[in-house]
Amino acid sequence: MYFKNIIGQKNIIKQLNLLFENNQVPHSQIFIDRYNSGGLPIALDYSLLLLNNQHKTNLNQKIEIKRNYFEHPDLNFIFPLPGPKNTISEFLSPWFEFLKSKKYHPVEDWLNHIESGNKQGIISVEVIKELNKSLRLKSFSGGKKICIIWGAEKLNELASNKLLKLIEEPPSLTYFLIISKNEKKLLPTLKSRCQVIRIPPTKNEDIKSYYTEVGIENNKQAYLINASMGSSSRAIKLSEDEKNTIKLEEMLIKCLRLSFSAQKT
C-alpha cells in the first residue's frame, strides 16, 4: 500500500522501509530533490507509513488516514507563501487541491497555483513560530506528530535558525521531513542535525513504465523519456501535454468529418 504510486526510486523506498522496520527512523530527515523526482510524494507516503502504524491507532482511524491522509490532524505542512505576512492556514485549501493532482510539481508551479504573481515565495520566521506552537499541543492520535517542510530552500535566515532550534529541542514523538531542491541554500548547521537523503534522477526504465501505465504509445516514449531528463515532474508534464495533443487531434478529425458529412448532404 505504501509508496505504491511513486515513480521508481526503489532504493530510496527500500532505505525508508528498513529504517521503519528496524525502529531507526530519525526525528529529522532532509530529502534533497534536485531533479523534482519524488521528494514530496515520498514524504507523504512515508508520513502515512509512520502515522498508520501506531499501537494507539484503531481500525477506524486507519481507514480514515488511508482515504485522505494529507488532512490528518497529526500531519503538519510548511510550504512557501507569497509573502512574510501570509499564514499557512489561509492557504491550506489550495494546498490540499495541489496535493491531489500536482504533488510531483515544483515550487514554481505551487506559486502559480495560488496566483502569487512575480513573488518568489518565502517561509518566514512567523510560520515556524506557529509550527512550534502547533507541535507543542497533544497529538490527535496520542502518538506521533509529523511535519513536512516542502521548498525548504525558501526559508529565510531567521526562519532557518528558528527551525534549527526546534529540531534541536523537538517535542516528543515529533518527526520532521524536510524537502529541498537546492541543498546549497540550506543552513549548514540545519543539515548537520538531520539525516540527509539525496533523491537521484528517475531511471529511464521507471519513466517508461509510467508512460506505459498512463497509455503513452510505445513509438512516442523514447523521445519523451529523453526530454524528461530524469525528472518525474517533467515526465508527468510531458505525458499530460501529449494526452492534450492527442485530444486536440481527435477533436480536429471529428470536426473535419462532420464538416465533410455536412458538405455531402
Residue map of PLM features:
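Loop/turn-to-beta-strand initiation segments
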Residues: 141-146, 171-177
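Conserved catalytic/switch belt of AAA+ P-loop NTPases
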Residues: 136, 161-172
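Conserved adenine-binding aromatic site and its adjacent loop/helix in ATP-hydrolyzing domains
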Residues: 133, 165, 192
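Residues immediately C-terminal
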Residues: 154, 169, 185
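Clamp-loader machinery-focused feature within the broader ASCE/P-loop NTPase space
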Residues: 2-154, 158
